[in-house]
A protein has these predicted regions:
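Primarily auto-inhibitory N-terminal propeptides
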Residues: 20-190, 217
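Active-site core segment of subtilase-fold serine proteases
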Residues: 166-327, 331-369, 383-388, 451-467, ...
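Sec-dependent signal peptide recognition
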Residues: 3-10
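C-terminal subdomain of the subtilisin-like protease fold in secreted/lumenal serine endopeptidases
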Residues: 342-351, 359, 389-390, 491-548
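C-terminal motif of bacterial Sec signal peptides marking the signal peptidase cleavage site
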Residues: 16-17
Length: 548
C-alpha cells in the first residue's frame, strides 16, 4: 500500500518468469511417482484415491442423453443412476452404480459460464467400495462417449495440525506497547505481524521478521467488498473474534438446503461444522490470520480484519475437511466452484496433493484435469471491482523438499513458503522450484520460546481444550498471511479507485517483499544444519503489507 512507483520493465520480466513451468527441468525424485502411461483417457493412478467412486468427463455429444435422463429421474423423485447411453449403462449396470450426478450442480445465473468452461461435462459415479477401481476405470475409458476418467486423489493439510492453546497466565504479559493503534490484548504475541525481537518468543528472534503490517494498517485495514474463501476445515463462524467478519450469503440456495449462510461443508454435504472428532481447528486458525476482527478489545488481530467498525474483509467458509472425512479432488473442486460463483476474489488454500506425486505443471494439468479446470474457472471470475480475476494462493507444503507441492507449484498460482521469528526458513518448509513468496509460518518446537514461536490465531474451543486462541505451525499458517496482505492490497485499491489486471496485481504482490537471501549464508540454526541451501529458493522475498 506504500505509494511507490513500480518499474514496469522489472515487473513484466518477473511476470514472464513466473509464467513458465517452474518444474520442467526438475527430474523425478526417488520417492516421486513417475509420469504414468495410461490408456490415454485415464488421467491419474488409484494410489491414495477414494474407494467406491470415479469421476468421468463425458463428451459433449453425450450430454443431451444424460440431461434427459436426469429430468426423467427428477420427475419421479429418484436418484440418477444411469446415463441413457447403452454402452455406458452396460458398464454402470455391471458396477451396480448407485449414483450418477454432475460434479458441479446446475448453477442458475452462472450456468451459461459453467457450460462455456465445460464444467457441466464432469460427472461423479458411486458404487460399492469393494469394486476394483482400476478395472472400473479401464472399462469406462473404453467407451467413446467418455473422454476422461479421474480417480479422486486425497488432499492433505499443510500443517501437522497440532494446536497449542494460548494461556495468558502462562505467557505472562498479554499487553505491551506495539506499533499499532488496535486494542486487541494478544497482538503483542503475534510476532508474525509486528516483531520487536521479543526474547520470550525466541532468543534468536529478529526485529522486523514479520509482514510489516502496522504501517499498512494506517492506510487501510480491510474492506467488506473483498471476500476471501477459506478452502479448508470449517470456519467457526460463531467465534467471538470472527463472527463480525463472516461472509453472509444474501441468497442461500435450495441446492444447499438453504443452509449455506456462511458457506458449505462440501466434505459432508451439509452445513459448516468444526467440533467433530478429527477436526483440529485448522480452518478457523487460518481464517483468523486473514481477518480476525481488529480493535474489538478481545483476542487477536487479523491481517485484514478491519478497525472494529465492520470494515474487515469477509470470510467465506468452503469446507473440504470435516472430522474424519478427508478432502479429495471432487470435494475441493466443488468448493472452488462455489467460491467463484458466490463472490470470492481470493482463494486461500492451505492444503495440497501429497508431495512428489506431481513434478511439473504438465503432470498436474494432465493428471488432475478437473481440479485444474475448477481453479481456472475461479481465476477467470471478476468478483472484485479492483481486480479482473480471482487470485489463487496455496501453501508450498511441509515436506522440507526442494520443490513446491501441487497445486501450489502451478505457474498461475502463488505458492507460499514459511519462515520463523529468527528471520530464517522454518525447518519443515518446502522451497525451490515453484515457490513464489515467503511468510511467517512459525516453529512450535526447536526454538527457545517453544509454541510461542508458532503463529497465534483463533481456534475452536470444542477441539482445543476450551481455548478460543492458540498456536500452530506450517506453510498452512504462512499462506493466510499472504492472502491477508493481498486482501489489504485490494481493499486499498478499492478505496483509491484503482483497477488492476490479475497479472499486474500478482506482480505487485510478488515484488512487495523484503529480501531474505542475505541471511542465508553458511551457517545453521537449532533446527536446520545448513541454511544456505535455501538461498534463492524461498521465493521473491518476505511479503510486506506496507509496500503493496
Amino acid at each position: 500500500m506504500h505509494n511507490k512507483t513500480k518499474l514496469l520493465i522489472f515487473a513484466s520480466l518477473l511476470l514472464a518468469a513466473c509464467s513458465t513451468d517452474p518444474m520442467q527441468e526438475i527430474p523425478n525424485r526417488g520417492d516421486s511417482a513417475p509420469e504414468i502411461e495410461t490408456s490415454g483417457k485415464i488421467c491419474n493412478t488409484s494410489d491414495d484415491a477414494v474407494a467406491g467412486s470415479l469421476i468421468v468427463k463425458f463428451g459433449e455429444e453425450a450430454i443431451p442423453s444424460l440431461e434427459q435422463n436426469a429430468l426423467n429421474a427428477a420427475k419421479t423423485r429418484s436418484a440418477l443412476t444411469r446415463s441413457g447411453i447403452e454402452s455406458v449403462d452396460d458398464i454402470l449396470n455391471d458396477l451396480h452404480v448407485t449414483s450418477l450426478e454432475r460434479v458441479f450442480p446446475e448453477a442458475g445465473e452462472h450456468e451459461a459460464r459453467t457450460r462455456a468452461a465445460g464444467l457441466h461435462r464432469w460427472y461423479v459415479l458411486g458404487f460399492a467400495s469393494e469394486e476394483d477401481l482400476d478395472k472400473a476405470a479401464e472399462r469406462l475409458a473404453g467407451v467413446a462417449e467418455i473422454s476422461k476418467v479421474q480417480f479422486r486423489t486425497r488432499l492433505y493439510r499443510a500443517s501437522d495440525c497440532k494446536t497449542y492453546p494460548f494461556q495468558a497466565t502462562a505467557n505472562g504479559q498479554t499487553r505491551a506497547l506495539v506499533t499499532a493503534d488496535f486494542n486487541d490484548p494478544n497482538l503483542f504475541w503475534q510476532w508474525h505481524y509486528i516483531n520487536n525481537a521479543d526474547q520470550a518468543v525466541a532468543t534468536t528472534s529478529v526485529a522486523g521478521a514479520d509482514i510489516n503490517v502496522a504501517d499498512a494498517w494506517k492506510l487501510t485495514a480491510g474492506n467488506p467488498e473483498v471476500i476471501v474463501a477459506i478452502v479448508d476445515e470449517g470456519v467457526k463462524y460463531t467465534h467471538p473474534d470472527l463472527a463480525a467478519n463472516m461472509w453472509i450469503n444474501p441468497n442461500p440456495s435450495p441446492e444447499y438446503k438453504n443452509q449455506d449462510i456462511h458457506g458449505w461443508n462440501f466434505a459432508a454435504d451439509g452445513p459448516i461444522s468444526w467440533g467433530q472428532k478429527g477436526d483440529s481447528g485448522h480452518g478457523t486458525h487460518v481464517a483468523g490470520t486473514v481477518a480476525a476482527v481488529n480493535n474489538n478489545g478481545i483476542g487477536v488481530c487479523g491481517v485484514a480484519g478491519g478497525t472494529g467498525k465492520g470494515d474487515g474483509v469477509r470470510l467465506m467458509s468452503c469446507q473440504i475437511f470435516s472430522g474424519d472425512l478427508t478432502g479429495d479432488a471432487l470435494v475441493s473442486s466443488r468448493a472452488v466452484k462455489y467460491a467463484a460463483d458466490h463472490g470470492a476474489s481470493i482463494l486461500q488454500c492451505s492444503w495440497g496433493i501429497k508431495a512428489g506425486i506431481y513434478t511439473s505443471d504438465n503432470m498436474f494439468i494432465k493428471q488432475s484435469p478437473m481440479d485444474y479446470e475448477a481453479l481456472q474457472y475461479f481465476a477467470a471470475q471478476k468478483n472484485c471491482e479492483a481486480l479482473d480475476g480471482g487470485l489463487i494462493i496455496f501453501s508450498a507444503g511441509n515436506e522440507s523438499t526442494a520443490m513446491s507441492g501441487y497445486p501450489a507449484g502451478y505457474r498461475d498460482y502463488i505458492s507460499v513458503t514459511s519462515f520463523s521469528p529468527d528471520y530464517l526458513p522454518a525447518n519443515y518448509t518446502n522451497y525451490g522450484s515453484g515457490c513464489n513468496i515467503a511468510a511467517p509460518g512459525g516453529e512450535t518446537s526447536g526454538l527457545s520460546g517453544g509454541e510461542k514461536a508458532g503463529v497465534l490465531s483463533t481456534l475452536c474451543s470444542e477441539t482445543s481444550n476450551g481455548a478460543d486462541y492458540g498456536y500452530m505451525q506450517g506453510t498452512s499458517m504462512a499462506c493466510p498471511h499472504v492472502s491477508g496482505v493481498a486482501a489489504l492490497g485490494l481493499s486499498y485499491a478499492l478505496e483509491k479507485g484503482k483497477r488492476y489486471s490479475l497479472d499486474e496485481f500478482k506482480t505487485m504482490l510478488l515484488t512487495s517483499v523484503n529480501e531474505i537471501d542475505s541471511r542465508l549464508g553458511e551457517g545453521s540454526k537449532a533446527t536446520i544444519a545448513d541454511v544456505s541451501i535455501y538461498r534463492g529458493k524461498m521465493g521473491t522475498g518476505i511479503t510486506d503489507a506496507y509496500q503493496l
